[in-house]
Amino acid sequence: MKVRILNEPINVELSRIAADKSISHRCAIFSLLSDKPSHVRNYLKAGDTLNTLDIVRTLGAQIQERGEEVIITPPEKILEPDVVLECGNSGTSMRLFMGLLAAQDGFFVLSGDKYLNRRPMARVAKPLVAVGAKIDGANEANTAPLCIRGKKLERFKYDSPVASAQVKSALLLAALYSNGCEFSEPELSRDHTERMLKGMGAKIKTQGASIALEPMSTPLAPLDIDVPNDPSSAFFFAVAACIIPNSHIVLKNVLLNETRIEAYKILQKMGADIKFKEISGKYESIGDIEIRYAALNAVEVSENISWLIDEAPALAIAFANAKGTSVLKNAKELRVKECDRIAVTVAGLKKCGIKARELEDGFEVSGSDASCAIIDSHGDHRIAMSFAVLGLKCGMIIEKSEFIATSFPNFVSILRKIGASVED
């Protein structure tokens, strides 16, 4: 993909951004917790979430599409499949299904593409095994394919050493089908699972970063939901408005969950003019985000990292356009995402002439003028999109840009809508 320099301000209202990926995954998986059809409007039809929907179908659900609505009718009982459950490039799918299937009667095999099958899964497998699940795979169940022999678990208490929505969600799903649990983490991670379970009628109590969950004695209520726009996807265009002088963007109908808008608040700390307007929300807070261009200043970021881990590469682009040297710390998880996002982000910035260096758990970036470069995305959709945004300032050629479709299939069309010249 080739992005040319944008020589004019961005002035646009965006309403058709990618639907939220985290919510879409959960809508598909959590529909299995009910005995009635779930109605999901604006489901994200991207590679990762379509794989999740395919797995739900393989486990026995019937899926109908009526325009923008997906209707998911769950089976009476989750089926034992006679095929491998393919998660594609989605770590979220694999880790959440690990928890769900760990408590089901049957034998299940989860696998993914060559990139996902290299990513570490022990961070979820080990906690599940510690509470009684039977999971096996290569490298002591650290890499897929993963084999799961499901069974009902005893009630458990688990204090997670890391704040991770995927660890938390996997354990809660396993506990829901078993005998319940008590769970805690060092700080609150994304809380979509707790909110959606509560909205469906699960007996769940939350206090800060602690959760008490009772087992599911009867099926939960079905979902009836309009999936909001994804703040992580929308963030690329927030950064674009912050680095292209005199720009003004309104991002419509965006998920405003506090655990998902931390990156926007970092931009505010850097001097960005950003306003939030809450409008509605059944399971979650939803509204609009308005961004006007303002000069950015350097910042140090070391808290609530689990709330902005997906936005870190795009945040690095904002750092590169700020006055001074910015630092991101306590983000070691970036090294085990779709690629080593610390190393790849820093290498890409250096190729563009930006002074940047790796830290063990983050990166340091000094703002300066960037130059056009050829960037290898390493098959990481967020790396590709982040450097596409930087390309609006200096031009950019991005290799393996096809992976953008795993989360944001209309990203290029929105780039063109804001005035960019893009060659696929």
UniProtKB/Swiss-Prot annotation:
Active site: 310
Entry keyword Membrane: no
Alphabetized GO MF terms: 3-phosphoshikimate 1-carboxyvinyltransferase activity
One Pfam assignment: EPSP_synthase
Cystine crosslinks: none
Keyword annotations: Amino-acid biosynthesis, Aromatic amino acid biosynthesis, Cytoplasm, Transferase
Family according to the record: Belongs to the EPSP synthase family.
Protein name per UniProt: 3-phosphoshikimate 1-carboxyvinyltransferase
Protein's organism: Campylobacter curvus (strain 525.92)
Encoding gene (name): aroA
